């Protein structure tokens, strides 16, 4: 699988996981309508399917996705909850993304 397609899968996986979780959070914690929860649960179901479209093995895909999840979570918090990441958040994210990239995209036999 090419890197661009793989990154797209990670992007949409992140949207489904964080967006779905956020909608369920709004329903449970902020009293939003059950419609929020239903949409959230649907997105979380897609989150369970999308990683399986990657060609790498389960452990590698989920390990690398962990890095993507970190950046998506920080960006979501910044743009949706209006809590900007600080310099340590960015440094930690950079370190994690380097590791995730090595896990997912290092040339192997």
Swiss-Prot record:
Query: Would the keyword Cell inner membrane turn up in this protein's UniProt record?
Result: yes
InterPro entries hit by this protein: UPF0060
Q: Which GO terms describe its cellular component?
A: plasma membrane
Q: Where in the cell is it found?
A: Cell inner membrane
Topology with respect to the bilayer: Multi-pass membrane protein
Superkingdom of the source species: Bacteria
Does the entry feature the keyword Membrane, yes or no?
yes
Keyword tags: Cell inner membrane, Cell membrane, Membrane, Transmembrane, Transmembrane helix
Q: Where is the signal peptide?
A: none
List all membrane-crossing ranges.
7-27, 36-56, 58-78, 87-107
So what family is this one in? Belongs to the UPF0060 family.
* Protein name per its UniProtKB record: UPF0060 membrane protein PCC8801_1733
The uppermost taxa in this organism's lineage are: Bacteria, Bacillati, Cyanobacteriota, Cyanophyceae, Oscillatoriophycideae
